[in-house]
Amino acid sequence: MPIYLLSDEHPELFPPPERADKSGVVAVGGDLRPERLLAAYARGIFPWYSEGDPILWHSPDPRFVLSPDKLHVGRSLRKTMARGIYEVRYDTAFRRVITECSQVPRPGQTGTWITEEMMEAYVTLHEAGFAHSVEAWAEGELKGGLYGVSLGAAFFGESMFALAPDASKVAFVTAAERFQGWGFQLIDCQVETEHLARFGAENWPRRRFLSALARAMKEPTRRGKWTEGAAADP
């Protein structure tokens, strides 16, 4: 199956995700300008490539997804959350979160896929109100968190990190519960991990994911910084 080369002049144009090859790659090239990233996410496509390689755009089949209303939290983690060890904040340290995520060792990887180019692109998306960080703080220090993109009633998780036990888990669960209150319909986890499977994430066939995503894209986007005041339930 052919891999499509993206146009420099039309960042909104992507081939149908169904045309991805067996590895999930649907297109190559282009750039990471906000218009292109937002167009990609709205179609169920995301960038994932190594430093020095061309930009590869993915739409894997199956897709690992968590429905916020199916979130599962184990007893031990609930106890940790009840103890109030971590304070969860939104969008107060986005650049620090993505930088920490870029430094997390990954099994089988010698480098990072979160390149400088990638970091700057998502910082730009954050400044535009589409990319967000969820942070776990303790004693005034950042201990863990995650970042991702929000469009419509969907959150596209990109990466997470932890510098202390359960910090990223507390951030993730707190965010998922917040998303449920907001009426979000799905959290895109991209590819399967044992870590997220424990929270109830499942593999969906691409067709099911794209159908659910199309419904989620019909809802308004919570654009802007999710600081404490902005993040309050309506």
Swiss-Prot record:
GO cellular component, one term: cytoplasm
One Pfam family recorded for the sequence: Leu_Phe_trans
Keywords: Acyltransferase, Cytoplasm, Transferase
EC number: 2.3.2.6
Subcellular location: Cytoplasm
InterPro entries recorded: Acyl_CoA_acyltransferase (IPR016181), Leu/Phe-tRNA_Trfase (IPR004616), Leu/Phe-tRNA_Trfase_C (IPR042203), Leu/Phe-tRNA_Trfase_N (IPR042221)
EC class of the enzyme, as a word: transferase
Keyword Acetylation tagged: no
GO molecular function: leucyl-tRNA--protein transferase activity
A GO BP annotation: protein catabolic process
Catalysed reactions, as listed in the record: N-terminal L-lysyl-[protein] + L-leucyl-tRNA(Leu) = N-terminal L-leucyl-L-lysyl-[protein] + tRNA(Leu) + H(+); N-terminal L-arginyl-[protein] + L-leucyl-tRNA(Leu) = N-terminal L-leucyl-L-arginyl-[protein] + tRNA(Leu) + H(+); L-phenylalanyl-tRNA(Phe) + an N-terminal L-alpha-aminoacyl-[protein] = an N-terminal L-phenylalanyl-L-alpha-aminoacyl-[protein] + tRNA(Phe)
Family: Belongs to the L/F-transferase family.
HAMAP family: Leu_Phe_trans (MF_00688)
Function: Functions in the N-end rule pathway of protein degradation where it conjugates Leu, Phe and, less efficiently, Met from aminoacyl-tRNAs to the N-termini of proteins containing an N-terminal arginine or lysine.
Protein name, UniProt field: Leucyl/phenylalanyl-tRNA--protein transferase
Species of the source: Myxococcus xanthus (strain DK1622)
